[in-house]
């Protein structure tokens, strides 16, 4: 199999995001229920990172949802470790669920975090 860079790159830019972001990068894509789901990292104006979500039927033309998919926790156990952002998500399908590994960034440095979803609507 020969892999070629898509000549229409980039397939997603900050102009495609319906909320204010400074960047779009470091995406992961998986096929879920016949559609492509992309989770991507963005920086907000305050420098914090969030994870956005976009969907596509063909893997080239993506539509970004109106709200971010994963934002830093503001309360609970994760808030202390996500205060500067959530970054660089990876999507790992396993037995009908998707395990999401990502970097939680805070004054304590970078830590590995884990979340999961079945439907890319709700996250545990």
Go through each PLM region and give its residues.
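Beta-rich carbohydrate-recognition and catalytic domains
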Residues: 1-22, 26-84, 92-124
């Amino acid at each position: 199999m020969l892999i070629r860079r898509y000549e229409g790159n980039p397939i997603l830019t900050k102009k495609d995001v319906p909320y204010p972001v400074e960047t779009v990068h470091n995406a992961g894509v998986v096929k879920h229920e016949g559609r492509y789901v992309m989770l991507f990292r963005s920086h907000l104006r305050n420098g914090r990172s969030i994870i956005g979500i976009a969907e596509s039927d063909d893997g080239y033309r993506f539509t970004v949802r109106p709200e971010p998919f994963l934002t830093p926790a503001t309360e609970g156990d994760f808030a202390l470790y996500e205060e500067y952002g959530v970054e660089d998500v990876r999507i790992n399908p396993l037995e009908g669920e998707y395990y999401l590994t990502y970097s939680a960034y805070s004054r304590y440095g970078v830590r590995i975090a884990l979340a999961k979803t079945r439907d890319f609507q709700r996250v545990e």
